[in-house]
């Protein structure tokens, strides 16, 4: 199994759209089975993502709605557009920089996600506190 882990910084990055394209190109070239991302964010007050664009999403119970600029969703959309089945889950952990729902995501290329588990790894469990940390786990089909 090929696994890619990446700290994306997502929307905080300069030239975000260009870096998003580079990331997707790299994924298409390397074809990891699983992609684990941290610092995956969306603007907290951005419009909601249209449901028809959420192909492959495994909604994590209790998670916030996915917004139009959600980084994991936008990676998944581009992979689907390139003909790669991308199943994904995202969970927000904290409010970053006072404006981003920031969390972690796991993408699975070709294998649907069957279940998720989220558990805290910090003593702080306050969504407004930047020190809050948690882990997202997934079970994919066939494993």
Regions found by a protein language model. Give the residues of each.
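Active-site catalytic loop in hydrolytic enzyme cores
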Residues: 110-142
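Short beta-strand micro-motifs in enzyme catalytic cores
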Residues: 2, 101-105, 134-136
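N-terminal, active-site-proximal structural segment of metallo-dependent hydrolase catalytic domains
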Residues: 1-100
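Conserved beta strand-loop-helix elements of the APE1-like EEP
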Residues: 74-82, 98-116, 140-141
């Amino acid at each position: 199994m090929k696994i890619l882990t990446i700290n994306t910084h997502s929307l905080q990055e300069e030239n975000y759209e260009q870096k998003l394209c580079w990331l997707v190109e790299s994924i298409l070239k390397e074809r990891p089975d699983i992609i684990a991302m941290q610092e995956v964010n969306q603007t907290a007050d951005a419009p909601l993502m249209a449901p028809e664009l959420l192909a492959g999403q495994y909604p994590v119970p209790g998670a916030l709605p996915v917004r139009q600029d959600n980084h994991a969703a936008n990676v998944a959309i581009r992979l689907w557009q390139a003909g790669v089945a991308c199943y994904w889950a995202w969970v927000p952990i904290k409010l970053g920089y006072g404006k981003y729902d920031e969390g972690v995501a796991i993408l699975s290329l070709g294998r649907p996600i069957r279940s998720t588990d989220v558990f805290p790894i910090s003593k702080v469990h306050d969504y407004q506190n930047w020190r809050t940390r948690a882990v997202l786990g997934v079970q994919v089909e066939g494993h």
